[in-house]
Amino acid sequence: MQPPASAGLFRSPENLPWPYNYMDYLVAGFLVLTAGILLRPWLWLRLRNSKTKDGDEEEDNEEKKKGMIPNGSLGWPVIGETLNFIACGYSSRPVTFMDKRKSLYGKVFKTNIIGTPIIISTDAEVNKVVLQNHGNTFVPAYPKSITELLGENSILSINGPHQKRLHTLIGAFLRSPHLKDRITRDIEASVVLTLASWAQLPLVHVQDEIKKMTFEILVKVLMSTSPGEDMNILKLEFEEFIKGLICIPIKFPGTRLYKSLKAKERLIKMVKKVVEERQVAMTTTSPANDVVDVLLRDGGDSEKQSQPSDFVSGKIVEMMIPGEETMPTAMTLAVKFLSDNPVALAKLVEENMEMKRRKLELGEEYKWTDYMSLSFTQNVINETLRMANIINGVWRKALKDVEIKGYLIPKGWCVLASFISVHMDEDIYDNPYQFDPWRWDRINGSANSSICFTPFGGGQRLCPGLELSKLEISIFLHHLVTRYSWTAEEDEIVSFPTVKMKRRLPIRVATVDDSASPISLEDH
């Protein structure tokens, strides 16, 4: 938990965790190290003097500028401070890299990651400006492997009216009453079936099992494909495809990128078959059932007009990416945090059992609003997202010199708006490393604002499916704590290269009846 986001269905792909496969970059870094040493004088001078040009004219321009490039260190030639960045990612507190430099240089500082001079912001107000000034001032910045794999016209790369139109279309569909009623039932069915299978297993690895469930739900929303052989093949091809998101950008046969591109071809072929079948049977008299329907019915995209099936198939594949890591990780960490906090779990059980008894007495089915009305459950979700930091930030490239709060971000430089630094800031959140769902009842206005809590990103690329993501987690938690008890084995969170559990969170699950307490935890 930057694409990427921001934790969920249709989390903006731009909020993908970075880097996704750090070993490729370590190898690349050491391969170019020798060349870097030979070119050290030239590289070092270039990086150190990137904020100026030669001659008296540049000196005059600098006098006119009010802002200054933030202080900081560019580290070693070529590799910069990459090794420190990675080392902190493996620690129990990955934000240490940011905190150390914040104490030395302030909340906004410069550094060098993988030979690229960047500016890192741990300031919520600066992050807000970066997120909101999208398209005309900042554009997404990605490793070359991502652009090679997804193409120049992917959801990640498009800007302006095209991006805004797609975002609006998907957002409107995900908020539609028609979808809310249907998807609530679909998620319930998938969750109930998945949890029932857990009770039959001697040991459940939560991270793996939830990933299967959330992928099925995501594909159901995207293209109405039900579980079965086609779904299994689709998932296998998708897993092969996303392995190439962050890798050495070489396309020779046998390389990671080459294999992923081939998997993408097979994946798009499978999706295209569904899209073409839908085109033949398409009708506009009934509400859209999934995202395929939404995109096929939209007539406002010039690119789509020539090859609608190719356009829609490509976009569907791209929309699968955010759900692969964010939703499963959020649910898994919710189980982890609750397992370590029996008091919070007891309160969660109490709230959800009360709603379950009320619905049984009334003989009513659950609705979207029922799940979202569970206030403490929403507190648990917010606290999980704050601490998990599945999307630790977003990367942007400045299209021109930009001044924010006295800091100058030069044209062509990348800026990392760090979400994790804000979420773990002691000046905003008391005891930020403590799992405390009750903080959301007493939290001050500044911490609860959109600039201080950004698990779904922000600005024009705010995750359009954030409400749906919270619904899915709410349904999962409700049925877990009202139907089952579990004992969790010892496990720890790994924050690099992506957030995950070291042992995939093994638990033992047992069923409970309404009169029994679902709480059954090992001592921690």
Swiss-Prot record:
<dbReference type="GO" id="GO:0102097">
    <property type="term" value="F:22alpha-hydroxysteroid 23-monooxygenase activity"/>
</dbReference>
<protein>
    <recommendedName>
        <fullName>3-epi-6-deoxocathasterone 23-monooxygenase CYP90C1</fullName>
        <ecNumber>1.14.14.147</ecNumber>
        <ecNumber>1.14.14.-</ecNumber>
    </recommendedName>
</protein>
<keyword id="KW-1069">Brassinosteroid biosynthesis</keyword>
<feature type="binding site" description="axial binding residue">
    <location>
        <position position="463"/>
    </location>
    <ligand>
        <name>heme</name>
    </ligand>
</feature>
<dbReference type="GO" id="GO:0042814">
    <property type="term" value="P:monopolar cell growth"/>
</dbReference>
<dbReference type="GO" id="GO:0005789">
    <property type="term" value="C:endoplasmic reticulum membrane"/>
</dbReference>
<dbReference type="GO" id="GO:0005506">
    <property type="term" value="F:iron ion binding"/>
</dbReference>
<keyword id="KW-0503">Monooxygenase</keyword>
<keyword id="KW-0256">Endoplasmic reticulum</keyword>
<keyword id="KW-0408">Iron</keyword>
<dbReference type="InterPro" id="IPR017972">
    <property type="entry name" value="Cyt_P450_CS"/>
</dbReference>
<keyword id="KW-0349">Heme</keyword>
<dbReference type="GO" id="GO:0016132">
    <property type="term" value="P:brassinosteroid biosynthetic process"/>
</dbReference>
<dbReference type="InterPro" id="IPR002403">
    <property type="entry name" value="Cyt_P450_E_grp-IV"/>
</dbReference>
<comment type="similarity">
    <text>Belongs to the cytochrome P450 family.</text>
</comment>
<feature type="transmembrane region" description="Helical">
    <location>
        <begin position="25"/>
        <end position="45"/>
    </location>
</feature>
<dbReference type="InterPro" id="IPR036396">
    <property type="entry name" value="Cyt_P450_sf"/>
</dbReference>
<keyword id="KW-0560">Oxidoreductase</keyword>
<dbReference type="GO" id="GO:0016709">
    <property type="term" value="F:oxidoreductase activity, acting on paired donors, with incorporation or reduction of molecular oxygen, NAD(P)H as one donor, and incorporation of one atom of oxygen"/>
</dbReference>
<dbReference type="Pfam" id="PF00067">
    <property type="entry name" value="p450"/>
</dbReference>
<keyword id="KW-1133">Transmembrane helix</keyword>
<keyword id="KW-0444">Lipid biosynthesis</keyword>
<comment type="pathway">
    <text>Plant hormone biosynthesis; brassinosteroid biosynthesis.</text>
</comment>
<keyword id="KW-0752">Steroid biosynthesis</keyword>
<dbReference type="GO" id="GO:0048443">
    <property type="term" value="P:stamen development"/>
</dbReference>
<comment type="function">
    <text>Involved in brassinosteroid (BR) biosynthesis. Converts typhasterol (TY) to cathasterone (CS) and 6-deoxotyphasterol (6-deoxoTY) to 6-deoxocathasterone (6-deoxoCT).</text>
</comment>
<dbReference type="GO" id="GO:0048441">
    <property type="term" value="P:petal development"/>
</dbReference>
<keyword id="KW-0479">Metal-binding</keyword>
<dbReference type="GO" id="GO:0020037">
    <property type="term" value="F:heme binding"/>
</dbReference>
<dbReference type="GO" id="GO:0009965">
    <property type="term" value="P:leaf morphogenesis"/>
</dbReference>
<dbReference type="GO" id="GO:0048366">
    <property type="term" value="P:leaf development"/>
</dbReference>
<dbReference type="GO" id="GO:0010268">
    <property type="term" value="P:brassinosteroid homeostasis"/>
</dbReference>
<keyword id="KW-0812">Transmembrane</keyword>
<keyword id="KW-0443">Lipid metabolism</keyword>
<keyword id="KW-0472">Membrane</keyword>
<dbReference type="InterPro" id="IPR001128">
    <property type="entry name" value="Cyt_P450"/>
</dbReference>
